[in-house]
């Protein structure tokens, strides 16, 4: 008789413990139900990137001295630099510069170590294409500045979304500074 009673007591304790665990997880689920949605409706709303965001690389042809430091510090030897030595002035003349963004890992080493600051990272992150050969940007394509997300009036940015309007009570423009 005694083993049967202890068995029922263990069963009761296990049932209470299981109910407590289920109740705790249910309370966590309910606490998350009150939060505002985090999802961004991508084609219509774009996330404003931070100033340290590592997007597409911008290249200024006139500043480049063809030193090839960017190629040496790149972990995958990605930038292709074609140059010719001008014998009359005894300097390198840059002929072609290209980066294949299908291979680039966006580490930023080329930008960091460039002695003339001819490379910089932009906020552009929309590089998708149907043909991988279109991701090979030459000096002309690298020299184009991207359209700023804040300055693009066709896109409703996250700063003007309903989430911010609810939190602050008024819509924000692109010049408003917020502390998150």
UniProtKB/Swiss-Prot annotation:
Q: What EC class is this?
A: translocase
Gene3D superfamilies reported for this sequence: 3.30.70.3270
Cross-referenced NCBIfam families, in alphabetical order?
ndhI (TIGR00403), NuoI (TIGR01971), PRK05888.1-3 (NF004537)
Q: Which PROSITE patterns match?
A: 4FE4S_FER_1 (PS00198), 4FE4S_FER_2 (PS51379)
**Where would I find the 4Fe-4S ferredoxin-type domain in this sequence?**
55-84, 95-124
Family assignment from sequence similarity:
Belongs to the complex I 23 kDa subunit family.
Q: What is its EC number?
A: 7.1.1.-
The alphabetized UniProt keywords are: 4Fe-4S, Chloroplast, Iron, Iron-sulfur, Membrane, Metal-binding, NAD, NADP, Plastid, Plastoquinone, Quinone, Repeat, Thylakoid, Translocase
InterPro entries given for it?
4Fe4S_Fe-S-bd, 4Fe4S_Fe_S_CS, NADH_quinone_OxRdtase_chainI, NDHI
**Cofactor(s), by name:** [4Fe-4S] cluster
Give the protein name, as stated in the record: NAD(P)H-quinone oxidoreductase subunit I, chloroplastic
Q: Name one GO molecular function term.
A: quinone binding
Q: How does it sit in the membrane?
A: Peripheral membrane protein
Q: Provide the primary localization.
A: plastid
**Which PANTHER family does the record cross-reference, listed alphabetically?**
NAD(P)H-QUINONE OXIDOREDUCTASE SUBUNIT I, CHLOROPLASTIC
Question: Which residues are [4Fe-4S] cluster 2-binding?
Answer: 74, 104, 107, 110
What are the record's GO terms for cellular component? chloroplast thylakoid membrane
- What compartments host this protein? Plastid, Chloroplast thylakoid membrane
Q: Which gene encodes it?
A: ndhI
Cofactor notes: Binds 2 [4Fe-4S] clusters per subunit.
Provide the assembly information: NDH is composed of at least 16 different subunits, 5 of which are encoded in the nucleus.
